[in-house]
Regions:
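Soluble catalytic domains of enzymes that build or remodel membrane lipids, polysaccharides, and related
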Residues: 131-284
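Membrane-embedded alpha-helical bundles of multi-pass enzymes
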Residues: 1-132, 284
Length: 284
């Protein structure tokens, strides 16, 4: 999470305050693991501890993924690719549950043989399950990615028109969306990150310039893109002078198309990822 330190420091907080805020964030994430350790001690002698303890871990990980706006770092289910055998079926938190269940079964002092056998079977499924054999298809696309540091619109448009690609991807939040932009890149499939206004709401959106279809970013960055506690922490925003810190969250249900997009750190949100990939041909 060093990017938190860099971002806050960039907006003028200084090394000391940026470090303090980063430490607070680390402490916040650590609370969930602390609660889990307390739960282990509390339920260690319970008759159904083998199921209760993994369930507590599952609930804590799920809660951490959505409180405020969610901070799904250090999710156990995605730490090792070799254990993704059931990931498409049970998801990240479900995989985390199964990993903790395996550990609980291996540490079980009663019914040792059945516990070891059950743990071995679950581990085998995680190691060789269907998640390791997903077919990505044979279709190939030629893609051009415009570097995020490129912010000059004239240069971006020239690079886009010169590209001989099936798809051109622009940086996130490169500019405010204007329909005239789409006329500058005719007959090209371009997916770009724009600030899109609808009534009084402003979204950061991925927009297909050829079709006009868009996806609005749902998982916003706390303090950077929205105020998690509204006017209560408005003074913090004024102190840091953070731009675009009052964006609106995209709808949970968004219109499907043959392509879908995940913007910035939406990639680490299991529920958002799962919903976006269903029924789509491409994910950007």
């Amino acid at each position: 999470i060093t990017w938190i330190f860099d971002a806050v420091n960039y907006y003028g907080a200084g090394n000391a305050l940026s470090g303090f805020i980063t430490v607070l964030l680390i402490a916040y994430v650590s609370i969930y693991f602390g609660i889990f350790l307390v739960a282990i001690k509390f339920f260690k002698d319970h008759k159904y501890r083998v199921l209760i303890i993994p369930s507590v871990f599952f609930l804590l990980e799920w809660f951490k993924s959505w409180v405020i706006s969610g901070f799904p770092w250090l999710n156990l289910g995605i730490l090792s690719e070799s254990l993704w055998g059931l990931l498409p079926i049970v998801g990240i938190s479900g995989t985390s549950f199964l990993i903790i269940l395996i550990i609980a079964l291996l540490l079980e002092k009663n019914r040792v043989i059945i516990s070891r056998i059950t743990a071995s079977l679950i581990l085998a499924v995680l190691l060789i399950g269907p998640g390791h054999y997903q077919d990505g298809g044979d279709e190939k696309l030629k893609i051009t990615v415009i570097q995020p540091l490129t912010t000059n619109m004239e240069r971006i448009i020239n690079m886009t028109n010169e590209a001989e690609s099936d798809l051109v991807i622009w940086p996130e939040a490169v500019t405010k969306f204007d329909k005239t932009v789409s006329k500058l890149v005719p007959k090209k499939v371009v997916i770009g990150g724009f600030f899109r206004q609808e009534n009084t709401n402003v979204y950061t959106s991925a927009i297909n310039l050829k079709t006009g279809h868009h996806y609005d970013k749902r998982n916003l960055v706390p303090f950077g893109e929205f105020q998690p506690f509204g006017s209560l922490l408005k003074s913090i925003n004024n102190f840091f002078n953070i731009p675009n810190s009052s964006l609106s969250r995209g709808s949970f249900y968004q219109t499907k198309a043959d392509w879908s997009a995940l913007i910035c750190w939406e990639l680490v949100f299991n529920e958002t990822f799962t919903r976006r990939v269903r029924g789509t041909k491409y994910i950007v």
